[in-house]
């Protein structure tokens, strides 16, 4: 209802100048919210914490925890389909990379539910479906596991593989890329590269 009252003036480059539409000034965007023209994202975070609290397991355990995590994800997708059928608006589950909001959400959960070991006892919650950073896991196993959750995040998702300096092992970079291609998943793999550049004045800087 709030969006239906918005006009093209809120973002002229999007709604007036062709990025998304060519509406007139002050024209309502209401009609463009319906019938497949645009999508409303249902973002989520903290799947690990949810599963840990409900089952006592991580969603990475390939057992009870993972099964429950996939059920939660399927339920989110089912609700999106239900809302779409009722409202003629596309909804889609989005594996949210919420960045700094992980700290805000953790603080809110702690204030609401208190300190729960393994759930609210950290200063952050885990992004979307990601394997929590404190769990040790092989890079390829991580991709394989997270691929199943990416399938249930059709509105957008990304998996991260943090790597050391791989400049001496380009084959490892190649294998990561081919694995991501094989699973048809969105992957980011930031890694350290130590370089020395020179400015136009000839003085080096790191």
Regions inferred by a protein language model and the residue ranges of each:
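Long, C-terminal-biased catalytic regions of enzyme "large/alpha" subunits
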Residues: 1-206
């Amino acid at each position: 209802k709030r969006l239906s009252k918005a006009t093209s003036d809120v973002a002229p480059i999007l709604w007036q100048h062709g990025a998304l539409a060519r509406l007139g000034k002050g024209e309502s965007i209401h009609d463009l919210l319906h019938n497949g023209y645009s999508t409303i994202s249902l973002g989520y975070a903290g799947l690990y914490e949810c599963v840990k609290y409900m089952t006592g397991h991580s969603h990475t355990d390939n057992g009870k925890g993972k099964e429950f995590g996939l059920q939660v994800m399927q339920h989110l997708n089912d609700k999106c389909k239900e809302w779409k059928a009722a409202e003629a608006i596309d909804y889609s589950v989005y594996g949210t990379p919420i960045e700094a909001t992980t700290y805000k959400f953790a603080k809110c959960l702690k204030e609401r539910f208190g300190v729960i070991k393994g759930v609210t006892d950290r200063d952050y919650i885990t992004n979307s479906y990601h394997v929590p950073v404190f769990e040790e896991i092989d890079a390829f196993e991580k991709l394989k596991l997270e691929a199943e959750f990416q399938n249930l995040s059709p509105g957008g998702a990304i998996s991260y593989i943090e790597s050391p300096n791989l400049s001496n092992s380009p084959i490892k970079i190649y294998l990561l890329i081919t694995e991501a291609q094989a699973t048809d998943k969105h992957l980011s793999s930031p890694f350290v590269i130590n370089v020395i550049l020179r400015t136009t004045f000839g003085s080096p800087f790191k």
